[in-house]
Amino acid sequence: MTISTLSTCCRQTSRPAVVPYTKSRVIPGFFYVQPVCRCVLRGSRGNKSGAGCFICFVKSDYDYLLAGGGAAGLSLAYHISQEPRLRDKRVLLLEPAAKDQNDRTWSFWTDGPTPFDSIVAHDWQQLAFRSPGFERVFQLQRYRYKMIRGLDFYRFVRTELAQNPQFTLVQASVETLRNVATGVEAHTSAGLYTARLAFDSRPPELDRQPEKYRYLLQHFVGWEVETEQDVFDPATVEFMDFRGEQQQEARFIYVLPFGPRQALVEYTLFSEMPLPKAEYEAAIRHYLEHTLQLTTYRVVGEEVGAIPMTDHPLPASAGPHIVHLGTRAGRAKPSTGYAFQRIQQHSAHLVQALASTGHLPKNLTNDQPQFHLFDTLLLDIMRRRGEVTRDIFTELFQRNPIERVLAFLDERTSWPDNFRIMNSVTPWPFLRSIAHVLRGRPGKRS
C-alpha cells in the first residue's frame, strides 16, 4: 500500500495542485511514493521559489475508489483485500483524517465469528433489560454482544492493507464525485482521480422534508468510570435501563462493564433535539450515586455522540458508477442507530457480487422493505409520544425470547417471527402511526 500526504495549490496550472514540497509525513509500515511534478517535467518554475511543486496534478486510474476511510470505507477495503478473485484490482482510498485517535466505539451482537474478533475489546454473554415493573437478565445462547474501539479497528485494517500492494491511501478530502462514460471522476484536495467504480461513505447531505419524513437523533453522553469496590457484572451488558423519568421522550441508561470496577455508563435519548451537556451528566451521576449507590468513583474517559435516526430515503447509489456506503447508504438502522454489523453485511454483499460476476449486485443493499416500514412506525411513535417507546421495548423483551428480539432488531427474522413480534406489543400506537404513514406525513404530539 502507498501513502501520499497532499494539499493545495500551484500557480502555473488551472488544474488541482499542491504547495511546494517542504515536509511529508510517512506512516510507519507503508510505502511512500512521491509522484513527479509536472511543472518540473515541463520546465516550468511552478512557484515563486523556483522549485517544482510536490505534486501539481495527479491523475491515476483505479478500478475502485473509496471516498472515506472510516468504518464503512475501511470495512469495504478489508473485504476486498480478503477476496482472492479481486487481487488484480487497484484500489484508491481517500480519507482526510489521520485516523490515529480513538474517536468512537462500535457495539454489536453476532451469532458467529467476525473478521475482527481479534480486536474485540470485550464481549458479553448476558444482556439485561430494566423498566418499571419488569427486569430480566437474559442468558444469550447463540449470540454474543461485542465492542470494538475505533482506534483498534483503524490500526488493524490499515496494517492489513499496508501489506497489500493493490491498495493506495491518499490523505485528502473528496470534493465532488461525477459519473462519466468510463466510470467516475473524483475531484479532491489532492487533484483529480478516475476509477471504474466509486464507493462513497462521506456523511449524507439531506434536503430535509419534515412535512414528509421523520428526523430524530440517538444522542448520548457516556462516562468511563472506575470504582474502588466491585459494582459491575463483567458478564452482563445493561442494554436498556428505562427506570428513569422519560419526560415525554425515550430515555435510558446503557452500561458496558469491562470489569467489576470499570465500565462505560451512557445516558441515551431518542428524540429530536440534544440536551445541554449538564443534563446528561446529571442523569449519569444520579444513576451512579442512587441506583448503584456509589459514593466515590473516577471519570477516566468520556464519549459524546449523536446518530441520525430518520426514514428519509437514503439512496444506495448516485448514478451507475457511484455506490453509497455507511450512513450515506442508510446502514445505521433508523430505529436503533446500530450500524457496524450492517456495514459488514453490506460490504460482504458488494464484494461477493464483484468477485463472482465482475459487476455490482442488482439489489445494492439487499434490504427487505418490511423492516423499513417497522422502523418508520417506531420513529413516528417516538416523535409523537416518545415515552411510549419504553412500553414497546418492555413488551418486546417481556413477551419474546431474547434471540428472537435480537434477530428482529438485526432484520433477520422470518415473516412468521415478524408476526409474533408485532402481535406481542400493544397495537394502538402502531395503528395510529400506520394512518400517518398512509397519509404520507409524520404524526404530531396530540
Regions found by a protein language model. Name each.
Residues 9-10, 37-39, 53-56:
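Cysteine-centered motifs
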Residues 168-295:
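Predominantly flavin-linked oxidoreductase catalytic cores and closely associated redox partners
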Residues 62-92:
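N-terminal Rossmann-like FAD-binding beta1-loop-alpha1 element of flavoenzymes
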Residues 2-16, 24-25:
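Low-acidity, Ser/Thr- and Arg-rich intrinsically disordered low-complexity segments
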Residues 344, 348-446:
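Long, low-complexity C-terminal extensions of enzymes
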Residues 79, 88-133:
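N-terminal FAD cofactor-binding segment of flavoenzymes
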Residues 139-159, 201, 271-279:
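Short beta-strand to alpha-helix junction loop
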Residues 174, 245-247, 271-349:
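FAD/FMN-dependent oxidoreductases across multiple families
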